[in-house]
């Protein structure tokens, strides 16, 4: 039997992610990356339950927050990576849980991001951060010749534009043979 709460029928809840990860059940967290997330604000009573453990680097050695705003949760972060706002970036928009229909909308930048720029001139943000991190870790599927199509043509994945183009292509070609 489980020693902590499990919610098998609940959609996408993170109420036990931090308490479980900080207590080591079922797995201990070694790093936490938050993206536009503020669980301490969004989950009632969570701060009182995990405050001391969240601030203890022996319990959670690394916290990185990618966010356009300072909030209650990223106040604990070792690093805060600036992110863009919705009018500055690419993205996919879908309804939250509980909507009985599948739907998806595309978003593209209409203004230049105000975030700091990397050495190559690109705005620092979630996509550029994760692409750079994946390349630094040597993960497959990023960089030059990252992705191949069925005919063997290779495509790069170095920018947010390429990130979202590949995602859009997967959606557009879903089910097509």
Stretch-by-stretch model annotation:
Residues 1-166:
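Non-catalytic alpha/beta scaffold blocks inside enzyme catalytic domains
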Residues 174-177:
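Short, intrinsically disordered, charge-balanced linker/junction segments flanking boundaries
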